[in-house]
Amino acid sequence: MRICSDQPCIVLLTEKDVWIRVNGKEPISLKANHMALLNCENNIIDVSSLNNTLVAHISHDIIKDYLRFLNKDLSQIPVWQRSATPILTLPCLTPDVFRVAAQHSMMPAETESEKERTRALLFTVLSRFLDSKKFVSLMMYMLRNCVSDSVYQIIESDIHKDWNLSMVASCLCLSPSLLKKKLKSENTSYSQIITTCRMRYAVNELMMDGKNISQVSQSCGYNSTSYFISVFKDFYGMTPLHYVSQHRERTVA
């Protein structure tokens, strides 16, 4: 039986002993009540037996949110080897939770609460694989088709770091010139991405009690508070203080 998904990643749960074959290679045996995490994009996946209701479909956005949630320095994560079979397997400890997560992953989220519930359930499924040393590498590999996403993930994994183009390119095993070229083809640039990352972080910091503009500026990697205010105003159309006051007015209203 061939597995198809319009998402880059799936996690399946077995009800009985099965085998899984990826791209025609030697089949991998999987016992009952085991999970397999697979990269679906550009891969042919066959399984000897499968209950379609026990497949969780995981989108690029969920992967990006999950890597951000882990708060790891992604620059230290080894690159996934292209020659490796893109699959991780392990026993399932909470099959009932998995069933609910799989069900939600196939349902359109009609409300914000349903969207957040699905997100939380899929995070729970993914977290089972955290003990695997290759897990985060495989997650990053699944974002490879969009280089800008990978750059966002690397910078946001340690926003305080003094990043530059060469450092990020090295994390992706690319030359700085090739990274610039790839980002340009995606209608963005390194400077746009790092500014967006810093501004997102700045807003979160500003909403925390006790954080002043100078502290937020430094935590976002800016040595000059006045320059930080200028960049913030260009990005959001208002100064940091104006942004905070508007947010508080909306909250009170």
From Swiss-Prot:
DNA-binding feature ranges: 166-187, 213-236
Pfam families noted in UniProt: HTH_18
Any GO BP annotation: positive regulation of DNA-templated transcription
Gene3D superfamilies xref list: Homeodomain-like
Knockout-associated phenotype: No change in arginine-dependent acid resistance.
SMART domains to which the protein is assigned, alphabetical: HTH_ARAC
Induction data: By acidic conditions. Forms an operon with upstream adiA but not downstream adiC.
Domain annotation HTH araC/xylS-type: ranges: 149-246
Domain of life assignment: Bacteria
Keywords: DNA-binding, Transcription, Transcription regulation
PROSITE patterns, per the entry: HTH_ARAC_FAMILY_1, HTH_ARAC_FAMILY_2
Alphabetical list of InterPro entries matching this protein: Homeodomain-like_sf, HTH_AraC, HTH_AraC-typ_CS, Tscrpt_reg_AraC-type_HTH
GO molecular function: DNA-binding transcription factor activity; sequence-specific DNA binding
Protein name (Swiss-Prot/TrEMBL): HTH-type transcriptional regulator AdiY
Gene name of the record: adiY
